Amino acid sequence: MTTQPARQRTILRDISSRAWEHPADRGALVALRKLKGFDAVLKAVSGLFNERAVRLVFLGSAVRADEHQFPTLHRLLGEVAETLDAPDLPHLPELYVAANPVPGAQTLGINEPFIVLTSGLVDLLDDEELRFVVGHELGHAISGHAVYQTLLQRLIRLSGVTAFIPIGGLGVRAIVAALHEWSRKSELSADRAGLLATQDPATAFRVHMKLASGGRLEDLDTTAFLAQGREYLEAGDLRDSVLKLLLIENQTHPFAVVRAAELRRWVDSGEYTRILSGDRPSRSADDDATVSEAAREAARSYSETFAQSQDAVGRLAHDLAGFLGSAKGWLDETFRRRGA
């Protein structure tokens, strides 16, 4: 953890979490909530989860950041909360550093989420890169992701022990698969929150480069790394596309090169700049946002992704959608003429 010179950042007054939430994240959550038995599983697992006990585990085994311990992380949390104009939470999430050489971070909890960074991550990143990570995790907390992340972790640990859940093991596996899909999309949302917190795309890309390589920035190149991400997303035939789907089936996070490429795509779309300039969803208008709007945005997002994709499955989905749309138009016109 090293110190970088201070820089000015735009305070994002009244920003809604909708500003950084990836449409596919919201759409996956809408689909998840529609799954048969989801409410029963959520209720059952929530009853098994003792938030106080989990917090006590970290209180007893890790180090809580405050003015005296990891003061830089404590300061970063306060600054990130100010930048993201954190809404009226009861209090900021507690932040813990746990002894673990593997770089990682997570936000846990149901009613009072808290953040855990591993010592390996703190050692790997400089202060500005840690600002991105803290913003990423606070974004999870503000978006309400911690509830579903906690649910996924508990279900994974309970895999094979599902007789107590009314819908049975098969239904639970479907929910776990849907949670994995949502989790990967939620990471794209949180990356956007992290970028809005640091307001420096180069810093965000460096984090993913370090996570992929273990460090050694002198041997890395941002342009080449982003090109690598594009190659992974776009290259290959149908076999590679299927393999990529299988590779991430049980992953909670997209690969680092994919996350960097997706963040680059968001910056290039102009949306990031519009948010900084004031053209963004406001928290005060959240009550007017509807679930159907989230579903429509998700559908539009997937459609645009397929249209732009060079991946075999993406091209197939886009072409199939176009064919079905044309067929529907032809059938509609045929029936209209017959009825005339």
Q: What is the predicted role of each segment?
A:
Residues 66-68, 116-132, 178-184:
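Short pre-active-site segment immediately N-terminal to the catalytic Zn-binding motif
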Residues 68-74, 80-88, 167-234:
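Short helix/loop segments within enzyme catalytic domains
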Residues 125, 134-143, 189, 193:
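Active-site His/Glu-centered metal-binding helix of metallohydrolases
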Residues 138-157:
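Catalytic Zn2+-binding segment of zinc metalloproteases
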Residues 156-172:
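Short hydrophobic membrane-inserting alpha-helices and related fusion/pore-forming segments
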Residues 209-244, 249, 262-294:
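Extracytoplasmic and endomembrane cell-envelope/extracellular-matrix remodeling and assembly machinery
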